[in-house]
């Protein structure tokens, strides 16, 4: 209770102080106004008026006379403090009432005496209230008490006019002062700094994406714009041009040697190129990363090295790394996090590694256990750790029956297998091999082609039936052949091409679909469930350049081809071809049975003709 009473008394004192300040302000304002009016009156008619002191004396005498006191009475109550004014007793109130009632009547002098004042404080009833506030952008007006408290605080001395002038002059001089002109040396230092190069590389890539983005504002969702294409839709809209990638400096007059799609970022495509004979001062080897997501015409990343890049792949499980196999035999590793376009790692040119061109690089394994596998044309296969390319983890010579080494030109691993693989060779033979075990090395030889093997690929579509034993090959003998690891003779030979067939690849989603490209600039899609004599869909690239590489996207809805002039073309594959139906695996099984039966009949006929 004592704390509350002290707090209440303190609040009362503050209120009284504020009231005194207000009264003082009002009194000063009234005096100022009165002085102004008096000056005006004196200007019109100067009249000698009584002074303020005389007027106040007369008012005091009139007030004393109204209360029954004479001017000579020495009894004058002392001035009361603000605190005593706020607390009044019943006796004082009664005396005031009696005094008021006697106004106008003449009475004798009143005897004044001393009275004991008893002060009683009654604490106010505590009222608990709850308030809910809502934030708004409008600034609330300050309370009167806060304004008065601010008035009580002594204000800071204002800045002298001279100081203000000097400050303004300084500001004007700063604004008018020209910026510091950088010297050529300082400019070059900034341009070659690590921070500027990183910022410029990142910013230009974003600006290019924004400038190249094109949106069809005339697209009609009602479908009326599809009426003209109804015939194509009925025909399946088999192949349609999507994008073309070409760079005047980095890909002109260069041959596309390899293509690979990123598994982490499906829109990214890496392409490797060999040397440009027309530009001897440019790097011999180039690897460009193209972006399908944005309509920009420049590569996302540019990498190069001093030897022609014969093979390239994204390092699986390492989205920032790109691996390249070079003509000199070196394996190079680029990192897109680095501002350098040159390799961040490379293998040594020594007998422990490759000394011949590396046409095959592949990352196999799982997230926690994976290796980089490389094969060169001297038949040497090496296994590497991506963390250390100074020395291979293990190496092996691919030799068939203690004869000369196999000159490998292409390689493929079956789905989910990291030990067994198939390779194609320069002499036209196909070999199965394994990396580990008692029979490490070449296992079997498959003969059937009459020219060097240019491409090989194992069946990759996963479904109800396992077809991982199948693989296809392409060759200089103008044919594509279908094989199974269970038989060393080809199951079927596709002979619809009239030039070298440079590459072949199974669809990653459709069990009976594969693609091949030839030297006439033609891309063929074969759906073996529909026909085995002619391709289901074909298209020729404008200008008919030789197509060196073909690569499906992971979704199987787009396909990329690279030609001998450095251009990459992306085609959209029609839904009726690319998307398999539920019965495609069963149908493909029946197709294989028919192919095997026809091959057996042909072998029997050939056997009967030989004795005759």
From Swiss-Prot:
Modified residues (Diphosphoserine): 51
Family: Belongs to the dynein intermediate chain family.
Protein name: Cytoplasmic dynein 1 intermediate chain 2
Native organism taxonomy: Eukaryota, Metazoa, Chordata, Craniata, Vertebrata
Spans of repeat WD: 251-300, 304-344, 353-394, 403-443, 448-493, 496-536, 542-581
Gene, per the UniProt record: DYNC1I2
GO biological process: transport along microtubule
Organism: Bos taurus (Bovine)
UniProt key word Transport: yes
UniProt-listed PROSITE patterns: WD_REPEATS_2 (PS50082), WD_REPEATS_REGION (PS50294)
Compartments it resides in: Cytoplasm, Cytoskeleton; Cytoplasm
Residue numbers bearing the Phosphoserine modification: 51, 84, 91, 95, 98
Biased amino acid composition, Basic and acidic residues: 1-13, 20-43, 164-188
Keywords: Acetylation, Cytoplasm, Cytoskeleton, Dynein, Microtubule, Motor protein, Phosphoprotein, Repeat, Transport, WD repeat
Function: Acts as one of several non-catalytic accessory components of the cytoplasmic dynein 1 complex that are thought to be involved in linking dynein to cargos and to adapter proteins that regulate dynein function. Cytoplasmic dynein 1 acts as a motor for the intracellular retrograde motility of vesicles and organelles along microtubules. The intermediate chains mediate the binding of dynein to dynactin via its 150 kDa component (p150-glued) DCTN1. Involved in membrane-transport, such as Golgi apparatus, late endosomes and lysosomes.
Low complexity biased stretches: 82-91
Region spans: Disordered: 1-117, 129-188
Cellular component aspect of the GO annotation: cytoplasm; cytoplasmic dynein complex; microtubule; vesicle
Keyword DNA damage attached: no
Modified residue annotations for N-acetylserine: 2
Pfam families the UniProt entry points to: Dynein_IC2, WD40
Post-translational modification: The phosphorylation status of Ser-84 appears to be involved in dynactin-dependent target binding. Pyrophosphorylation by 5-diphosphoinositol pentakisphosphate (5-IP7) promotes interaction with DCTN1. Serine pyrophosphorylation is achieved by Mg(2+)-dependent, but enzyme independent transfer of a beta-phosphate from a inositol pyrophosphate to a pre-phosphorylated serine residue.
Primary location: cytoplasm
């Amino acid at each position: 209770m004592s704390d509350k009473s002290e707090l209440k008394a303190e609040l009362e004192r503050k209120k009284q102080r504020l009231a005194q300040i207000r009264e003082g302000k009002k009194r000063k304002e009234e005096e100022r106004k009165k002085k102004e009016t008096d000056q005006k009156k004196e200007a019109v008619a100067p009249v000698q008026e009584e002074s303020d002191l005389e007027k106040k004396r007369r008012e005091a005498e009139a007030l004393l006379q109204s209360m029954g006191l004479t001017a000579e009475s020495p009894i004058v109550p002392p001035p009361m403090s603000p605190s005593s004014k706020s607390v009044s007793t019943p006796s004082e109130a009664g005396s005031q009432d009696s005094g008021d009632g006697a106004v106008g009547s003449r009475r004798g002098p009143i005897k004044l005496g001393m009275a004991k004042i008893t002060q009683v404080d009654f604490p106010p009833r505590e009222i608990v209230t709850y308030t809910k506030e809502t934030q708004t952008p409008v600034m609330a007006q300050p309370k009167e008490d806060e304004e008065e408290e601010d008035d009580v605080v002594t204000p800071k001395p204002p800045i002298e006019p001279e100081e203000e002038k000097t400050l303004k002059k300084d500001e004007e001089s700063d604004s008018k002062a020209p910026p510091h002109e950088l010297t050529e040396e300082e400019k070059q230092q900034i341009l070659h700094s690590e921070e500027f190069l990183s910022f410029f590389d990142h910013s230009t890539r974003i600006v290019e994406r924004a400038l190249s983005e094109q949106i069809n504002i005339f697209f009609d969702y009602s479908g009326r714009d599809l009426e003209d294409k109804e015939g194509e839709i009925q025909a399946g809209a088999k192949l349609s041009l999507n994008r073309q990638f070409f760079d005047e400096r980095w890909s002109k007059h260069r041959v596309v040697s390899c293509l690979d799609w990123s598994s982490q970022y499906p829109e990214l495509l890496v392409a490797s190129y060999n040397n440009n004979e027309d530009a001897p001062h440019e790097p011999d080897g180039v690897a460009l990363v193209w972006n399908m997501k944005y309509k920009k015409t420049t590569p996302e990343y540019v990498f190069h090295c001093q030897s022609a890049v014969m093979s390239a792949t994204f390092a699986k499980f390492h989205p920032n790394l790109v691996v390249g196999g070079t003509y000199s035999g070196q394996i190079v590793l680029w990192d897109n996090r680095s501002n350098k376009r040159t390799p961040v790692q490379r293998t040594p040119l020594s007998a422990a590694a490759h000394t011949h061109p590396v046409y095959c690089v592949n990352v196999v394994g799982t997230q926690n256990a994976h290796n980089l596998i490389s094969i060169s044309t001297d038949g040497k296969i090496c296994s590497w750790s991506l963390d250390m390319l100074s020395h291979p983890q293990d190496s092996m010579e691919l030799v068939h029956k203690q004869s000369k080494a196999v000159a490998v030109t292409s390689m493929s691993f079956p789905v989910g297998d990291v030990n067994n693989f198939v390779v194609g060779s320069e002499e036209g033979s196909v070999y199965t091999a394994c990396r580990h075990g008692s029979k490490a090395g070449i296992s079997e030889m498959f003969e059937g082609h009459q020219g060097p093997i240019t491409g090989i690929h194992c069946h990759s579509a996963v479904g109800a039936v396992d077809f991982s034993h199948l693989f296809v090959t392409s060759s200089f003998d103008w044919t594509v052949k279908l094989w199974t690891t269970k038989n060393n003779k080809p199951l079927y030979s596709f002979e619809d091409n009239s030039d070298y067939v440079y590459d072949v690849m199974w669809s990653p989603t459709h069990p009976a679909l594969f693609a091949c490209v030839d030297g006439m600039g033609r891309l063929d899609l074969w759906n073996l469930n529909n026909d085995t004599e002619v391709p289901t869909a074909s298209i020729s690239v404008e200008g008919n350049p030789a197509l060196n590489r073909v690569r499906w996207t992971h979704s199987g809805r787009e396909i990329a081809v690279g030609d001998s002039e450095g251009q990459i073309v992306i085609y959209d594959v029609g839904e009726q071809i690319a998307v398999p139906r539920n019965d495609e695996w069963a149908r493909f099984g029946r197709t294989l049975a028919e192919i095997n039966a026809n091959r057996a009949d042909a072998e029997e006929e050939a056997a009967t003709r030989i004795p005759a």
